Structure formats: C-alpha cells, structure tokens
Amino acid sequence: GWCERVPEADEVLPAPLPPYRVLTGLVDRFGRTQTFHREAAGEFSGEITGVTDGAGRHFRLVLTTQAQRAEEARQQAISGGTEPSAFPDTLPGYTEYGRDNGIRLSAVWLTHDPEYPENLPAAPLVRYGWTPRGELAAVYDRSNTQVRSFTYDDKYRGRMVAHRHTGRPEIRYRYDSDGRVTEQLNPAGLSYTYQYEKDRITITDSLDRREVLHTAGEGGLKRVVKKEHADGSVTQSQFDAV
C-alpha cells in the first residue's frame, strides 16, 4: 500500500493517534472476533446496526428513535381502543449521565448463519421495551416471553428502584439524598444495607454479616483498594496511573 497523503517536512513521525477513534471490532486472546458494522447515512448514521462474529454469523441490530417509539405507542393505543399515554416525541438532549440522542436498541435478529443458512429464526433473538422517558423497561426472549422488568423513580429519570427476573421475587432499592443506594431489599433472599463514609463503605446483609470496602481517590478515580470480608479475610488491590 501507500500513504494517503505525504507528510510535511516538519511533522513528527509517527503521527500521534487521535484521542477518539471509531471502534470497528473486538478480538479476544483466543482469536474470537466481533466485527461492527455502522450505518453510513440517515438518522442512524455512525451507529452500530450490524455485528458479525467469528463463526460468520451476522446479527442485525434494530434501532429506534424516541419519535418512532412514541408513534408506535400511539398506534398500539388506537388499535387497542385505549387512551394514548403521555409519550413525548423527544427526550432532553442532555442529562446528568451525558448526551442523549434518544436512539435505543429495540431488537436483535440473526440474519445469516453459515452453518444453517436456510434455518434462520422468524423472530428476533431478543427484544427490548422502553419507557416514555427512554429507560429500559422490559426484555423479551425469542419466544416473546418477558424475562426482565425494571421500575424507575418517578422524580429522578434513570434511577432504578426495582427489577425482576420472570419467576423470581422483585428486588427493590432505596437511595439517600445524594443518589446512593442505601438498601437492597429481597423478600425471598438476602437483603443488604449500605453505609457510606468518606473512604469506606460498610455492607451488611440480613444475616448481620458485614463487609467493608476501603476506597482511595476522588470522583471518577475512586477505587476500592481493600476489602474486609465477613469471614475476617482481607483482599487488597493496587492500581497503576493509567
């Protein structure tokens, strides 16, 4: 091959990599690959809409906009003879979690399988339902059975207060005024409480067993450097500058 352009005489070579690059694939240590295919144009331009794995299978990722989901909700209400619920056509462009363009993954289809090219499933492998606020509400498997459900705080968008696996009890969460989880409540198993101090978090389960997480750093660089287990053992961790 050849260079796409001739570098200037005073350029430092090799040129530094750009700070942001487009992810095109993954390869693990066993050589297994995933190749990502991005939409070239249109409302989903630049978004990943296809994946090819190392076995040559191709998966299509169906994306939807907030406006499309709102229209679908209205049509479902009309066909069901019910009053349409409040489902806005747009979402806030920026939230405390970052920029939100309203695009969500709605389904994943297997569209090519070299081993069974004539035996592709007639339904998506998985389907996702979303709330009017753009939060993940439900997950459905290939038989269209709901396998996961999620509930969110009415006041704080994106704050999950409960979730459930089909056939299991609902797990609920309580938060403090800073948005930190203080309780995880399981009616059929272990529940947990969380107590926060400056550089430590104490976790106590419903059998009164306690673990303590010791942290170091600030903000997004805070890391768990020591964990005191309920049996008295201790695990310590070290991190490099990167």
Report residues per predicted region:
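Extended charged/polar low-complexity repeat regions
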Residues: 1-242
